[in-house]
């Protein structure tokens, strides 16, 4: 990505243009592929592009508006990705790199203060709802292995989030 006009002035590139750029990068990959995308708008100082001022709810905490913008950016990303042949056979894993401000007392408790969301999306599989069981970033690897049907032994400290079977470390 080489367009300084899209620099947010703090961390990197605004989410929407960056995700559109990354979609074009994914289009050039041979399958199967693994790719990691890290967006930055939901980090301090919690600002969004000026052209979107007033379009996203400011909510209860400064980060809410940024999350609205990131959500919009992901929607635009997926609208484009759905047109590609690789989309239906792709597993998308969303997670955060750290916890942050909260409006809910549940997350003020010590054990929940470091909570991060993990979301799985696989277009050709029905994942619906919310699972509030304790999970960790360590669980992503065995979950992906489970989703792709990997049936060989492997070492992991985590466990699959879609299976009730326990994987020994």
Q: What are the roles of these predicted feature ranges?
A:
Residues 1-169:
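Solvent-exposed soluble domains appended to multi-pass membrane proteins
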């Amino acid at each position: 990505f080489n367009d300084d006009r899209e620099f947010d002035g703090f961390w990197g590139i605004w989410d929407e243009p960056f995700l559109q750029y990354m979609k074009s990068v994914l289009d050039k990959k041979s399958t199967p592929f693994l790719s990691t995308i890290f967006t930055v708008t939901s980090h301090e100082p919690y600002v969004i592009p000026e052209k979107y001022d007033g379009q996203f709810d400011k909510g209860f905490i400064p980060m809410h508006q940024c999350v609205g913008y990131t959500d919009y950016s992901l929607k635009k990303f997926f609208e484009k990705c759905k047109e590609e042949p690789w989309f239906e056979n792709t597993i998308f894993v969303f997670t955060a790199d750290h916890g942050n401000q909260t409006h809910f007392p549940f997350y003020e408790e010590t054990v929940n203060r470091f909570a991060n969301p993990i979301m799985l999306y696989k277009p050709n599989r029905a994942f619906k709802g919310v699972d509030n069981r304790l999970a960790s970033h360590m669980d992503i690897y065995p979950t992906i292995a489970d989703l792709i049907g990997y049936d060989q032994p492997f070492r992991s400290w985590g466990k699959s989030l879609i299976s009730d079977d326990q994987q020994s470390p």
